[in-house]
Amino acid sequence: MKVLPPPSIPLLGAHTSTAGGLKNAIYEGRDIGASTVQIFTANQRQWQRRALKEEVIEDFKAALKETDLSYIMSHAGYLINPGAPDPVILEKSRIGIYQEILDCITLGISFVNFHPGAALKSSKEDCMNKIVSSFSQSAPLFDSSPPLVVLLETTAGQGTLIGSNFEELGYLVQNLKNQIPIGVCVDTCHIFAAGYDITSPQGWEDVLNEFDEYVGLSYLRAFHLNDSMFPLGANKDRHAPLGEGYIGKESFKFLMTDERTRKIPKYLETPGGPENWQKEIGELLKFSKNRDS
């Protein structure tokens, strides 16, 4: 099983809109100065998804070629719970995982990002084992080694969600790495909300060392860049524009300049829409360029 290699240059983007067609998210990315984007390939709040039409596939691939955007990420639907204790929801989730991965392969997308799941009334151990089983069922889709990596996103520690600590993510990665191409997407707001202090370079040093211990830095494949409206350890998933929350710009400067993180693709999910994303991308690129000068 071949695994998609990391990019050779820093890539920055945002979660852009597919209104009017999937291709439009790519063009919106170009218009805000992005080199990558995150999208929804289907309605994120419904179980059913439409079959991809050939015209949609061709237009999407043409947009990629025209804009030179790469390492596109799809964010899977919010209803999917790979560790659901309810057998009906679990089966729907497994079908949703399979369909999402299949569509991403068809479109030539590089990353597909999932929320790991919620234990609800079951134990976290049972939930994590179900999560492993759910993703394992999609292993045959990777027999031909498509350039796609499944990412599990860090969570903010609210409720019974899995993935708010690196030990849980490490368990999932270690149990899936020989079955599917697997990695982690670190959401800066989420890990801060979960108690990981990333407000300073030393804070990031400690966090990266802990991630390496439990998961392995080679499995850190993407970042969601968000500041936090709430303080450290609040377990609240509320995004703020970069530098306008409790995390601060120094944290994002570190990610753009440290050799371990600067080339890992980064996707903004901050409030403010395209105008703000264009400004934030410009500021992040300045951090990177100042490092090289």
UniProtKB/Swiss-Prot annotation:
One of its GO terms (biological process) is base-excision repair. Binds 3 Zn(2+) ions. Zn(2+) 2 binds at residues 153, 187, 224, 269. Its EC number is 3.1.21.2. The keyword Hydrolase applies. It catalyses: Endonucleolytic cleavage to 5'-phosphooligonucleotide end-products. InterPro entries: AP_endonuc_2, AP_endonuc_F2_Zn_BS, Xyl_isomerase-like_sf, Xyl_isomerase-like_TIM-brl. The keyword Iron-sulfur does not apply. Zn(2+) 1 binds at residues 75, 115, 153. Its cofactor is Zn(2+). GO terms for molecular function: deoxyribonuclease IV (phage-T4-induced) activity; DNA binding; DNA-(apurinic or apyrimidinic site) endonuclease activity; phosphoric diester hydrolase activity; zinc ion binding. Keywords: DNA damage, DNA repair, Endonuclease, Hydrolase, Metal-binding, Nuclease, Zinc. PROSITE patterns: AP_NUCLEASE_F2_1, AP_NUCLEASE_F2_2, AP_NUCLEASE_F2_3, AP_NUCLEASE_F2_4. Endonuclease IV plays a role in DNA repair. It cleaves phosphodiester bonds at apurinic or apyrimidinic (AP) sites, generating a 3'-hydroxyl group and a 5'-terminal sugar phosphate. Belongs to the AP endonuclease 2 family. This is Probable endonuclease 4. It comes from Chlamydia pneumoniae (Chlamydophila pneumoniae). The gene is nfo.
